[in-house]
Curated annotation (Swiss-Prot):
Family in the record: Belongs to the SelU family.
Keyword Transferase: yes
Biological processes annotated in GO: tRNA wobble uridine modification
InterPro entries: Rhodanese-like_dom, Rhodanese-like_dom_sf, SelU
Described purpose of this protein according to its UniProt entry: Involved in the post-transcriptional modification of the uridine at the wobble position (U34) of tRNA(Lys), tRNA(Glu) and tRNA(Gln). Catalyzes the conversion of 2-thiouridine (S2U-RNA) to 2-selenouridine (Se2U-RNA). Acts in a two-step process involving geranylation of 2-thiouridine (S2U) to S-geranyl-2-thiouridine (geS2U) and subsequent selenation of the latter derivative to 2-selenouridine (Se2U) in the tRNA chain.
Quaternary structure note: Monomer.
Source organism superkingdom: Bacteria
Keywords for the protein's UniProt record, in alphabetical order: Selenium, Transferase
Coiled coil: none
Protein name: tRNA 2-selenouridine synthase
Species this protein is from: Shewanella sp. (strain W3-18-1)
Length: 369
């Protein structure tokens, strides 16, 4: 028979082993932030939780508990128990948790036990596990050397990182490619979920005992996902590797990312007509987001070129004109901005080179650690 309570010392194992977890908090709590491999099967729905909370403030704990039992009773109670039982049947090693590992966890566990099902609940609940993950992020930069991978837009930093076992892909976790055109079709995670997933990725990285932690040289915001301040500060002090690629390679890579992949993704999701409309809006809105920094005249020039490229794409199935506005965007906006930023931190640059040269340098760095 499993232990009735999962101790805080097991948090690391829970996250590393992707342990299935039953989150019995209300849906509104789950939506704000949750853990990977958790499923929301609430003891109380949002409206029920709100009523119990109001009762607690006005009349105290015992009255609130009594109200909770009256709200979740009879057929409603039976439906909740059946949903939990079904989850446990599919996930026999599941744990459960509420916000603090208190009454909701204990009551859920008790009702399941009365139905003949033993499920341990996690000590401290969501709040304690969340604090644990925040601690992981804060400690990570002190665990091993931190290296920051930089390079001009389109040089393939993400492609490179995905080939390196010592790397953590921040943009993948944020579901955003970092630039003004970096939005993906699916939405970004909530800020809390971004931080939780980052912490778990760092836990896995530490488990594998790598020679360094390799990250892309990101801004504080990746789309709308904010890097935790202490982690970002450590990144700002890290030594830098600069990835270099020919302009032609960068252009074609960006056309593939901004145009081919996004167009295909929108069409798969929405169909050809609606997909092209959504794809066009994505490009034009991305350009609009940097209008102030471009200036009105330069923005208008790029917008006209972009519209011409879209017209040719839809009429002739030809994406070659997209290279024109991408080239202009690189050389009038992204490249000067990057060069200015790199110059300010040039004293931290350890190495510059191509993909192959960078792999060789990192392999050698690994062997010397």
């Amino acid at each position: 028979m499993p232990s009735a309570i999962v101790a805080a010392e097991q948090y690391r194992e829970i996250f590393l082993n992707q342990h299935p977890m039953m989150d019995v908090r209300a849906p509104i709590e789950f939506t704000r932030g949750a853990f990977p491999n958790s499923t929301n099967l609430p003891l109380m729905l949002d409206s029920e939780r709100e009523k119990v909370g109001t009762c607690y403030k006005q009349f105290g704990q015992q009255a609130a508990i009594a109200l909770g039992h009256s709200l979740v009773n009879g057929p409603i109670k039976q439906q909740r128990i059946e949903a939990w039982a079904s989850y446990v049947k599919a996930n026999p090693n599941a744990y459960l948790y509420c916000f603090r590992g208190g009454l909701r966890s204990q009551l859920t566990q008790q009702w399941l036990k009365e139905a003949g099902i033993e499920v341990p609940y996690i000590q401290g609940g969501y709040k304690a596990m969340r604090q644990y993950l925040i601690g992981v992020i804060e400690a990570a930069p002190t665990q091993q050397p931190l290296l920051s991978l930089s390079g001009m837009t389109g040089c393939g930093k993400t492609d490179f990182l995905l080939q390196r076992k010592e790397a953590v892909d921040l943009e993948g976790i944020a579901n955003h490619r970092g630039s003004s055109f970096g939005k993906n079709i699916d939405p970004q995670p909530t800020q809390i979920n971004f931080e939780n997933q980052l912490a778990i990725a760092l836990l896995r990285h530490q488990q594998d005992n790598h020679s360094c932690l390799l990250l892309e040289d990101e801004s504080f915001l990746i789309g709308r996902s904010a890097l935790p301040q202490s982690f970002y500060s450590a990144m700002q002090a890290a030594e830098i590797l600069v990835l270099e690629e020919p302009d032609d390679t960068r252009l074609k890579r960006l056309r593939n990312e901004y145009v081919h992949k996004m167009y295909s993704g929108f069409c798969e999701r929405l169909g050809l007509e609606a997909g092209f409309a959504a794809f066009s809006e994505y490009l034009l809105q991305s350009l609009m987001s940097i209008r102030k920094r471009l200036g009105g005249k330069q923005h208008q020039e790029l917008q006209d070129l972009m519209q011409q490229a879209l017209n040719q794409q839809i009429s002739q199935n030809d994406t070659s004109l997209h290279l024109v506005w991408i080239h202009l965007l690189l050389h009038k906006y992204y490249d000067p901005m990057y060069q200015y930023q790199l110059q300010k931190k040039s004293e931290r640059v350890l190495f510059k080179g191509s993909h192959q040269a960078m792999h060789e340098w990192l392999n050698n760095f690994k062997s010397t650690q």
